[in-house]
Amino acid sequence: EARGVIILEVANEVNNVEQDSLVEILSIKSPTLDKIIEQMLTNDDNVTAEMILKEIGFSRTGQGSTGSGLVSLPEILAANDLPNTGLLLIDGSGLSRDNQATCGLFQEILEDSEYGTTIEKALPLVGVEGVVSDVFLGTPFESNLVAHTFFDTDRGALVGSYTTSEGIEVLIT
């Protein structure tokens, strides 16, 4: 009611209702996972990253928690022959300063025939969109590099793909 919504009656709890007797009043179709990942990487959306990790945990253990996702992720990497040596994850958002991953892992993910293309297509274009819209302006990377970056006072990272003036694609980790 504080926002102009007037509630005329109190809701009633109803149990043991037959599914056939229910009437759908609203349906919202979720974007596909590749679009969710694109939004996450373009906007540096840490909440979405954390929620994806929890969903991974739920799909593998039945528990939608950060902990179950953290246990599941190295198993998924190993099952796909991706290296998880040197991988230490504390959260799914990527905000913990204790998270660790190797360049080799990111390189192999980008090179992976099943996942690499999806990730590469989801990365924002440097100098144009999202979290990288204001980096590398006036350089050959502007509009030729799709990347996700992280920069802090004492460290940084960049993962992406650069197309040279000769049309050669170079993966950068």
Sequence positions of predicted segments:
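A small/polar active-site loop signature that marks catalytic segments
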Residues: 1-117
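C-terminal soluble interaction/assembly domains
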Residues: 72, 85-173
